[in-house]
Each structure stands twice: as structure tokens, then as C-alpha cells.
Amino acid sequence: MRKETLLVICFLTLVLGTVAVIWSYALPAFKPLNLGHAKSAVVSVGAARQERALNPGELASLNQWIETHRRGWGPLAKTAPSSGDAVVSVVTDQGASYRLILFTGLSGADWDNTVIVQAGPDAPFRVHDFKSSVFAPLRQIAEQGTYQRSAPP
């Protein structure tokens, strides 16, 4: 085998090996979220984190929203400005739990209409920002309860 051929083979092996390693880490981020059907949910809203259970209509709306928005979630690459304006804690039919952290624009305008999902206690955070019309069902769930809003900074 000639020296040039060996160098080309080594170079291709190095490049393809690097690509394979990168894709093995990146591929799980492209899988759609499979959160499961929500059996019950509690929303914590406002600075005081006042809790209330979701009624059956809100639960149906949440399940429909989750089912239609399984794709497009990416890893959380930067620190969120706060712990969210509302947190929806969900228990599925299988007994698993996950959290939806909603940013409605109160704690950071650039995080408006953003949702962070944590599919379990040790699961990584996944984030997605939405258009106002797509985020509207979640905003309605978050803002339906009465709570005292904190003063702007």
C-alpha cells in the first residue's frame, strides 16, 4: 500500500469517527418528546407559587397541546432568567411525572412564550419557544387563576 493511500484512509477514518461520535451525542436531542397522557396536573403560578389543580377541560387542552407539540425541543443551552412564571406538574397514566416550566413574559421578555420540560427528576431540560397563538392554551392555563402579581423590578 502506498503512503498516500494510507494517509487518506487514516484521514477518512478520523473524520468519520469524529462525525459518528458527535452524532451519537446529538441524535437523542432530535427525538420527539414522549411525555405520556396526563392523568392529573397542578399548576403553580405567580411569585408566591399559589397552586391549583387543573380542571378536566384544562387537562384535555393540555393533553392536546402536548400531543401536537412533540417535535422541535432542544437542549437548554443557557440559564433561564428565573424559575418560570408558572410550573405545571403533571402525573401520567403510567404514574410517571414531568414538569412544564412556562415563561409568559413576566420574568423575562426575551423568554416570552417559552416552555422548558423536565421529563423526570434526573432528565435533562428541553426548551422550545413558540408563537403567541401556539402558546395561548398554556397561557390560559397559567393565567386563569387569581394571584397577586409582583411589582416589576
Model-found features: residue ranges?
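Function-determining sites in protein domains
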Residues: R2-P153
